[in-house]
């Protein structure tokens, strides 16, 4: 029995079961990882009776983890060289490399992440502190604010309740009122 998140399973399958790894960003989202020490949290593992042996090795977000097994991947041996949580990857991909830089991604959900640099910053307003990435043994942290169903809620208004006929109609309705009376 082994444990891992989606990227751990994908790497395991693509390498033909040879590599069981994750990166720091994914490990930090398992609720089993201590973001201060950068290790699996033994107190939590003991509390939940989880054997450390089933957890993946935690690696930098960009390094060669292994190679695809030609027997399971189109006859090709290709290096697998980077994994990250999707929103942390978007933070990196949108060049939010310096502390204080922010990105927002809209889709099914809405996700705003801010690079907070090399030390975890605790939010007093309900944001999640997480590992953004680790490169060359240097860890970068972020704060994450998420509305998990923002886009899905618009779809529900259109398809479920039939209050609107198109997503763009939400803007027209929002602009049609004098003020929001504090509702956002």
List each language-model region with its residue ranges.
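Active-site core segments that coordinate phosphate-bearing ligands/cofactors
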Residues: 1-20, 31-42, 46-47, 68-184
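A short, surface-exposed helix-loop junction/capping segment
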Residues: 20-26
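Residue-level "edge-of-site" marker
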Residues: 57-58, 171
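Gly/charged, well-structured mid-domain segments that form the phosphate/adenylate-handling core
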Residues: 60-64
